[in-house]
UniProtKB/Swiss-Prot annotation:
Family: Belongs to the class-II aminoacyl-tRNA synthetase family.
Domain of life of the organism encoding this protein: Bacteria
Cofactor: Zn(2+)
Native source species: Aquifex aeolicus (strain VF5)
Residues reported to bind Zn(2+): H559, H563, C661, H665
Domain commentary: Consists of three domains; the N-terminal catalytic domain, the editing domain and the C-terminal C-Ala domain. The editing domain removes incorrectly charged amino acids, while the C-Ala domain, along with tRNA(Ala), serves as a bridge to cooperatively bring together the editing and aminoacylation centers thus stimulating deacylation of misacylated tRNAs. The Aquifex aeolicus domain can be used in vitro to replace the corresponding domain in E.coli.
Higher taxonomy: Bacteria, Pseudomonadati, Aquificota, Aquificia, Aquificales
Protein name, entry field: Alanine--tRNA ligase
Amino acid sequence: MSLSAHEIRELFLSFFEKKGHTRVKSAPLVPENDPTLLFVNAGMVPFKNVFLGLEKRPYKRATSCQKCLRVSGKHNDLEQVGYTSRHHTFFEMLGNFSFGDYFKKEAIEYAWEFVTEVLKLPKEKLYVSVYKDDEEAYRIWNEHIGIPSERIWRLGEEDNFWQMGDVGPCGPSSEIYVDRGEEYEGDERYLEIWNLVFMQYNRDENGVLTPLPHPNIDTGMGLERIASVLQGKNSNFEIDIIFPLIQFGEEVSGKKYGEKFETDVALRVIADHLRAITFAISDGVIPSNEGRGYVIRRILRRAMRFGYKLGIENPFLYKGVDLVVDIMKEPYPELELSREFVKGIVKGEEKRFIKTLKAGMEYIQEVIQKALEEGRKTLSGKEVFTAYDTYGFPVDLIDEIAREKGLGIDLEGFQCELEEQRERARKHFKVEAKKVKPVYSHLKELGKTSAFVGYEHMEWESQVVGLVKGEGLVSELKEGEEGEVVLKETPFYPEGGGQIGDAGIIESDKALFKVEDTQKPTEGIIVHIGKVLKGTLKVGDTVHARVDKERRWDIMRNHTATHLLHAALRNVLGEHVRQAGSLVADKYLRFDFTHFSALTEEELKRVEELVNEKIRENLPVNVMEMAYDEALKTGAIAIFEEKYGERVRVISCGEFSKELCGGTHVSATGDIGYFKIISESSVGAGVRRIVAQTGRWSVETAFKEHQTLKKASSALGVGEEEVIQKIEELKEEIKDREREIQRLKQELLKLQIREVVKEENVGDFTLHYGVFEEVEPEELRNLADMLRQRTKKDVVFIASRKGDKINFVIGVSKEISDKVNAKEVIREVGKVLKGGGGGRADLAQGGGKAPDKFPEAVKLLKEILSG
């Protein structure tokens, strides 16, 4: 009986609904109120508190098809995914549950009825297992259902006894298997399709089992697995809801499924991981460097790495998101709602990692080669940390790559390196924290506070109420001394809300103090940080405080422009854009915002043009003070990270922009002059950054760029409008020449083969051997690959000498790899060359420190082949 996965899912849920079960919608992949789990990894997880007696539901019978993710902890299938036909990270679990209602007899009856009468599986092909001491379950299967004893297996605690933890609810289980025929072996012949858990005991701290007053039922049937049986497929990856993703991988890579094991592994990884990241991100898990986000980033980067192995060097996974959504949106309509968001996040992640993927792979291959040459069995903690920290490779991915070459990783050493980095960060944090000094609290206690008058004034007559030098209060600061000045009132704006502090001059009759920065270390205290240029400044002096007006005007232009930029981004990109951080300086502004992908040239152009349009309109910039709640009702945008009091300032630029803000601004947008975007980049998952300039600084940058264009035009000998075209032509010329160089290299190597490589018949094999001078390891592998395919009995042993180092490759025809194992042989010859190696049965590589020993290594190889 061939049924689609969607049909099987619906048949299951409908069947149990008819048996009095309430259909429960799948919970999100992120467990609710369960800090013990990163992800829902079994069908029973959403009902965990019901089983524990901590929660009551309005039903005693339930059925569900639960989204699951197994990537961490005890149930971690990540490293197996791709290498087997059954392991997945994401899968769906069909289940029926009883909370103190029916028990073994009904659970077994329902399961048997569903598999034999609804799914029409032949009874004679079905086997069951029971816990060795569960006589009740055995009798029900044997006497009530009628399964002969030879098709009932009694298994031990490891296979057929389930427990939630070391203590708590537990009980025996029973599994249903289908016999797929003699052409299959082991687990693939007798395939487990359904697990019935009879939760009838409570285990205490001493391991003592006590019967539960109301036993429960928890069953689980993997949808992908039962679909493979009903659709007659050899692998879960070939069923109707997954195989289109394999085909997607074929399409983007140009490789064919079923022709080569390594290709199949990569295509299965891509298919599985696409499902996992699509569902996880749709459920709100954004890739990051910690917790659930890090797990999803690991999955995504693992898929990218396998794509890279297939020759895919550009972002591609985001394109597959559409396919996952199209296949799965019928049972999970929420996928359609988040389609574009998921694609954007995935594409952004790919673009970030693709920049370091190639360099990271080269680095890892380099340290693997070094380890092999040195005869080490592991990559050092420092090497692993560099791959992790510099290139962004998850540790388990580094471990997987190393194991492919027969190496391990020094996990303990890696943890030490990681802890050292964290300690450096902690020390840095402690240094930063010292900025808040007890002296400021003392000033407040003395009533020596400051009032800010800088919204209306840039100059102000004031009085010195406090002087700080180092960690304490002083009565005076002399010429040449650095310190901090506290004024009764000040026009100097202290750093806050992303805006840098003002600079300027504080002058008395007898002293001149240069203000380099202004800070507000605690509420009510504004400190002017700088140096006495002339005379002596004393507490109680009357002073004239004068802000650097030109600098302040630059800052105000940038701050108002930041508001215009925020509004323009929301206008062009959508309402999802939110401020995620900002820096308003004098020479530039920096604005971080939420968005899932890099802005296109067209989007950047539209944003820049819209801001400049609003500048030309010379919109009035109005400031209003009002209650916080009232401000939000008017549509003013609040910044998530900021803390607001009951009264807030609302800055409006005409009808175009309205935000809560405590900074200083121009009085009309025309005062900004000109706005120019300098750069757009990523600062993290789902967060972009724009750096821009205004006023005189933007004009200066535009002038410099034009000067650069003029110089490029002159150097290339073309008009300014033809510079890009000329550069593209030159790039193509370089590519053509590089291709020609590669072609000539290959021709040269072929000529060298005739001169360098000798051929001898040894035993039943044809041996090709020789030493080249300074040939790259990759070219050496390619040569070995070519030579081992000449006949069906080729053994290749070629090497490349560079100084006192030697790299070498052993390759054998696939047809004889069961007789001559390259991976085993390379270890033996590697010893002679004072090194080692690893790889596959048909192709292995290594390195050593004794190039002069190559003839001896050849002699040993001949002895091995002669048998």
